[in-house]
Regions:
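N-terminal structural segment of carbohydrate-active enzymes
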Residues: 1-96, 104-106, 111-115, 149, ...
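The substrate-binding groove and active-site-proximal loops of carbohydrate-active enzymes
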Residues: 15-34, 66-80, 149-164, 181-190, ...
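Aromatic- and acidic-residue-enriched segments that line the glycan-binding/catalytic groove
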Residues: 30, 63-74, 103-141, 201, ...
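Core domains of carbohydrate- and sulfate-ester-processing enzymes
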Residues: 93, 111-153, 241-264
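Active-site-proximal helices and loops of the catalytic beta/alpha 8
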Residues: 117, 186-269, 323-350, 380-384, ...
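Aromatic/acidic polysaccharide-binding cleft in carbohydrate-active enzymes
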Residues: 227, 273-295, 300-342
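Carbohydrate-binding surface patches
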Residues: 369-403
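C-terminal beta-strand-rich structural cap/linker in extracellular carbohydrate-active enzymes
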Residues: 417-435
Length: 435
């Protein structure tokens, strides 16, 4: 079985995690701050995470998505040797490493675009970008395409074989130097699909179990997630449904999305596929801020770790960190501060560890058992094993789901005969396996 099917991800945005959100001056000596991740490996393992998805780590102008050099670790984080040490330490502890592949666009200081700015149409790299007659917002003497109108993000010409080869060669270096296990493709919905097919062939040639996950927002995710392109995509449909269902006290919303995606009907869209599921990330408000009632953190995390998909937790959110997107992106990407374990971290740890060891949760089918506005229960089943998840967004409630047998709540150690009524406290959850 591919490793990613049993993965539980910890998502780190390195420039924020290391407190390096200031613009790159391109002159300072490398800092070595990325090595701080090594110190947190015991805590990451204790939380039950067996994979890390790193946001951008390569030299960039400011935020990492404005790449300057795909072959060099950002000096604000450290050196290539520093990052290799981090990856080696993670692998020695059984933790997979996934990097952010930002291939749709680069920063204005990207070496090839700088050469174009200097020599204009004479540049051998002019066809690496989408250039036109006219002028740019930066008075370059030519017009170029920026990503969604952001001209500090220069669109690469992915139809150019030289550009595609440069990207593939960069990935080859990352596999050789850092032994990475996969990529998250930034704005995958913008990428040429023939490029995605070529990229998949190259990555699977480098490593047979290499994981490709794409950032997608709307539409039919099968456009990108299929045997010719990506293994997985970001499940933004359920991201919205998760927090909205708790805020509106309407479990029907998230249940509708999960049934639509993974139910038993032939028309269900993604049954048997592994989408990346999350409650927050570096682009959106923290879940503790999004929830109207923070006492809902436990049941929403229980739902995340028991619904179909690959769960991911954004660094700091395991402690209930807050940050509002309306206050700017930097607040979403705060420096990591070591904290003592809390009731929430211990709760997430139990869920994460159980998820990685439970085949019903990793690859099992989904069957809805109970649904009301405030309460939701479902079963995950695989080869005779059953896991039952009970989510209570309301006041104290007793579930009657009609499944026989004695089951153990992995969160409390209590046992129940599920053919009888099962009490679940307000704003809480139970996750059962056969006793």
């Amino acid at each position: 079985m591919e490793w990613f099917k049993t993965a539980s991800f910890y998502h780190i945005y390195p420039l924020g995690y290391c407190g390096q959100l200031q613009p790159n001056d391109f002159t300072s000596a490398p800092t070595g701050r990325i090595l701080s991740v090594i110190d947190q490996i015991p805590a990451i393992k204790e939380m039950g995470f067996n994979a890390i998805y790193f946001g951008p780590v390569f030299e960039s102008v400011k935020h990492g998505y404005d790449t300057v050099d795909y072959r060099t670790i950002d000096r604000r984080l450290g050196t290539n040797e520093d990052f290799a040490k981090v990856c080696r330490a993670l692998h020695e502890n059984g933790i997979k490493v996934v990097l952010d592949g930002v291939f749709n666009h680069v920063g204005r200081e990207f070496w090839a675009f700088k050469e174009v700015r200097q020599t204009q149409r004479k540049s051998e790299y002019r066809d690496w970008f989408h250039l036109r007659d006219g002028n740019s917002a930066y008075n370059d003497g030519f017009y170029y395409e920026g990503w969604e109108g952001h001209y500090d993000l220069v669109k690469l010409n992915l139809y150019n074989p030289q550009v595609r080869q440069y990207i593939k060669d960069s990935i080859t270096q990352w596999v050789k130097e850092f032994e990475i296990d996969g990529l998250r493709l930034d704005v995958a919905y913008c990428l040429d699909q023939n490029f995605l097919k070529e990229l998949r062939g190259h990555c699977k040639w480098l490593k047979e179990d290499f994981w490709l996950m794409g950032e997608t927002l709307h539409g039919d995710y099968n456009r990108w997630m299929n045997p010719e392109m990506l293994d997985s995509v970001t499940n933004y449909e359920c991201y919205k449904g998760l927090y909205s269902s708790f805020n509106d006290m309407n479990m029907f919303e998230i249940a509708h999305s999960i049934n639509r995606q993974f139910g038993n009907e032939n028309w269900c869209l993604y049954r048997g596929k592994n989408l990346y599921c999350f409650l927050d990330n570096h682009d959106v408000s923290r879940i503790a801020t999004m929830l109207k009632d923070k006492s809902q953190l436990k049941p929403i995390y229980a739902l995340l770790f028991t619904m179909p998909g690959i769960p991911g937790v954004y660094y700091g959110s395991e402690f209930g960190w807050e940050a509002d997107k309306h206050d700017g992106d930097d607040g979403l990407r705060a420096p990591y501060v070591k904290q003592e374990p809390t009731e929430l971290t211990e709760f997430i740890s139990k869920l994460s560890k159980f998820h990685t060891e439970s085949l019903p949760l990793c690859v099992g089918s989904y069957r809805q058992l109970h649904l009301q506005n405030h309460n939701y229960a479902f079963a995950r089943e695989y080869e005779g094993e059953t896991v039952v998840s009970m989510i209570n967004a309301g006041e104290d409630f007793t579930f009657n789901i009609g499944i026989g047998g004695t089951y153990e709540d992995i969160l409390t150690g209590e046992t129940f005969d599920l053919s009888q009524g099962v009490p679940v406290r307000a704003h809480n959850a139970r996750v059962f396996q056969k006793a």
